[in-house]
């Protein structure tokens, strides 16, 4: 597997679908000066998906890296600086193929984008996910991220 910079001219506006399975969600409630998390299982596991595009128009000077098996794109990560507050935002990270999940593809993509944020001297890296995307939450925590709200 190779990690390569994705050419913006070739990928901008190209559509993709991200999929994940989930058995529950984290209920977030205000508590004092912070919040509490409580895991709530669904009655049955569910599959969720959403459609998006590479290099969204709303991103400020985005960059993206792809994970390739030969010529096949099996995953990617995308991010951009938010210059107004010197933060680097990871806008998308996705491993498309179920067989590639848990094999280190996401970790290598995350390392590439974290290095990009360091090169740009970002004061912090942020990202968002759905409260029901259990695997993503676990992955982000494993890679040093904390839940902040």
In which residue ranges do the predicted regions lie?
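DNA-binding alpha-helical recognition surfaces that contact promoter or target DNA
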Residues: 112, 119, 138, 142
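Extreme N-terminal starter segment of soluble prokaryotic enzymes
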Residues: 1-2
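Glycine-rich ATP-lid loops
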Residues: 102
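Conserved GNAT acetyl-CoA-binding A-motif
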Residues: 88, 117-128
């Amino acid at each position: 597997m190779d990690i390569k910079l994705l050419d913006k001219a070739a990928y901008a506006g190209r559509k993709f679908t991200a999929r994940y399975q989930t058995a529950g969600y984290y209920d977030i409630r205000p508590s004092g000066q912070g919040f509490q998390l409580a895991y709530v299982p669904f009655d049955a596991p569910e599959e969720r998906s959403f459609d998006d595009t590479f290099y969204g128009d709303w991103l400020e000077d985005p960059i993206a890296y792809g994970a390739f098996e030969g010529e096949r794109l099996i995953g990617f990560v995308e991010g951009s600086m938010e210059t107004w507050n010197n933060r680097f935002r990871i806008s998308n990270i996705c491993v498309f193929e179920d067989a590639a999940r848990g094999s280190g593809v996401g970790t290598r993509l995350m390392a590439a984008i974290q290095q990009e944020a360091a090169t740009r001297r970002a004061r912090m890296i942020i990202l968002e996910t759905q409260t029901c995307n259990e695997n993503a939450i676990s992955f982000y925590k494993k890679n040093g991220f904390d839940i902040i709200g």
